[in-house]
Amino acid sequence: MGRLLCLCSLVVVLLAPACAPEAAATDPIARGRQVYRELGCANCHEASLSNFFRPVGPPLNEIGRIAPKRVPGLSAEDYLRQSITDPGAYVVPGYPDSMPRGLARDLSTADLAALVAYLASLR
């Protein structure tokens, strides 16, 4: 019984950090990755069982490379920022205009900049 209690205690101690809320990252790209996860962006932009392996929104795994080519005259960062703040301004062909409106309203200026930096880093 003592060994079992000791083993259970060890498991709790080892798993506790994994269950704790993630501390806010200070690196903009790391913080952007955190914001991406917190907002649930992967639910629509990554293939999964829930969306039958085809993302609802365009995949973002190489968006940093693709973004500068999407809208002539917009840098990758400007395109990404516009896609978050005004999602209907440009809709990727083959995908519905389903990006949530008002998403940027819920983001601080720093979190929006971090999210843009993270997305721009995906190549």
Regions found by a protein language model. Give the residues of each.
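C-terminal motif of bacterial Sec signal peptides marking the signal peptidase cleavage site
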Residues: 15-18
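C-terminal capping alpha-helices of c-type cytochrome domains
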Residues: 20, 99-123
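Bacterial N-terminal signal peptides that target proteins for export
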Residues: 1-8
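Generic structural signal for secondary-structure transition and capping sites
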Residues: 41, 88-92
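Short, hydrophobic secondary-structure boundary micro-motifs
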Residues: 53, 92-94
